[in-house]
């Protein structure tokens, strides 16, 4: 647990996932394997970082290659040192750019960057005679969060970490009654304003056990006693999909 939904953590915390890609995490009593480099949630997981007024927005004006500042369509509370992502506005996925903020001005709408842009990110804004507005612009997202979960695996491995929220049944020995009791666990996770770095596992896994960064499996309908959600998080440098409800 790091913070509560109504009382988020304000300090900086890194959760570092270590271990070999060949070492599986095993459930007790021959309950099976959760796989390698995994946070297995069979109880409750709460991770809540500092919320932001805006986590992603769009460019207000074109950002040309060579520029060291960009103008946003919304005011943000981001600060110098934060990392951001600018999406491509052409057909080249490698024209997505990762930048670091050097300064924030004009009430939070102008970001000065630590290095010039490598590519142009366009904005198209048209108002038609009937009053309809067409606006297409590159997106700008905040990557930085004060809580980070990341893997020490190398990019060549393509096997990062994952968070598996699921259920589990086993028999637990009752020493008083001298018998085994059937016990059922069901996990839940409330996660907000967390940065996941190096998530997901690019491996050949069973259909119902794919290796997304966050895998929510067999949790049933939403329940007030197990209110699972993912809110305002960033997913950075992954090897599989960010999350899935299965």
Regions found by a protein language model. Give the residues of each.
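Beta-strand/loop edge motif enriched in small/polar residues
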Residues: 1-246
